[in-house]
Regions:
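Cyclophilin-like peptidyl-prolyl cis-trans isomerases
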Residues: 1-110
Length: 110
């Protein structure tokens, strides 16, 4: 999968054998164009960048408000956790969630 950014592309490798429901969710949203024009709403230099708020983060919508970006998700139900033993090394993509382990929806961080 390729994440197209204004400054270049990011190749993303997904692991359906490790997190099948999360991978399917990302692929579905991407294939439906839901991630198009969605901003990175949380960036911590040298640490992580978070995006994927398809409800409030689409900068091409008339009602876009950066201060609300990061507070929403898709219209699909939240996903149950699929925790695994893969390390969070630099460049790893992971689904974002609240303190509820079963709250991943559309947001992810790298």
């Amino acid at each position: 999968m390729i994440l197209q950014l204004k400054d270049g592309n990011v190749k993303i490798e997904l692991y359906p054998d490790v997190a099948p429901n999360h991978v399917e969710r990302i692929k579905t949203l991407a294939n439906n164009g839901e991630y198009d024009n969605v901003v990175f709403h949380r960036v911590i230099d040298g640490f992580m960048a978070q995006t994927g708020d398809v409800k409030f983060g689409n900068s091409s919508k008339d009602d876009f408000n950066l201060s609300r970006s990061g507070m929403g998700g898709s219209s699909m139900p939240d996903l149950k956790q699929e925790f695994n033993n893969l390390p969070h090394e630099r460049g790893t993509l992971s689904m974002a969630r609240s303190s509820d382990p079963n709250s991943a929806n559309s947001q992810f961080f790298i």
